[in-house]
Structures are given as structure tokens and as C-alpha cells.
């Protein structure tokens, strides 16, 4: 988390040049919580507090966890903003049989911001990848959570349709495969280009 703090710096959401909302979930009430002011790092930390991976975050009188538990594709927070285009990213797209091809590290070597992101991802990578049974407890838990989030995402998107939808295949990587960051960044670029091409056609 120290690397993440270094990426976002020490600033408040109100100081950002564009509007920002981090979405979290109130663990006790199950309510969706929009974090639109206060410390940026604290808001992001609460919004990524994935159950069984990161500890919940105490925010005022609430205990917050990952917002994806109740809203995997949060479009509603943007409805009040003055925007020309609404772009959504859904990581629960249709599964694909072939993984994305690996890319060269040179593609990100010349960009300091991407280097900082890669440093954060590499810091989270375990020294040794533990051998986990193909359908072990964690695998079943995360797959079940993903299935629930897929259903919630479809319901949310039926109510709020974005102008551009960028979809990533749900089986693009495992939950802890942080070391595949370069490959997945390139996959994201490819899917973004495809989504905008469809939107223009």
C-alpha cells in the first residue's frame, strides 16, 4: 500500500482537476457508498478492499469494503457530471479460450507513470507462486463472487447504459496474477481500441 500511496500522492479529492468518485460498500448495511471528498488514498484504499484479500477500512462510523460487491460497473456516480461521453469498463466479459499474447517490456519502459504502476504491481507479486488446487477454497470463493458480480453488473448496465463499453474477458487472468501486468495492460489497450471502433461505426 506504500507504493499505491506514492502513486496517488497526498492530496484530497476536492483538489483533483476533474471530478472523482470512489465507490465502496458499507459492510454492515450493504449500502453503496460514494466517496467524493477527503483524502484520495483513503478513498481508493476503501474502494479496493476486496474481501479475503485486503482488510476493511474504517471511514467515519462505517466499515467499508470493495464497491464492486454491490456495483461492479458504477455509472450512476457520473450522471450528475457535465460530460460529453460516458465510458465504462466491465471486466466480466465473455470468457475466451486463448490468452492474450505477451508483450515486450519496452512498450512501457519509456513512460514514467506506467513504470510506477508496474512497480506497484510487482511489489504485490509473491516471491513464489503457491500451488493452489484447481478448485480449492479460494478458487471457489472468488469464482462465486465473480458470478454474483456478473449478475449485478448486467442489472446495473440495463439501467445505466454507457456510450462506450470496454469489456475484458472474465478469464483473462487469475485473481493473484499481478506479474502479468504488462500483458494485461496491452490487452486493455486492444479492447479499448476495439470498443471505440465499434462506437464510431
Which residue stretches match the model-derived regions?
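Patatin-like phospholipase
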Residues: 1-201
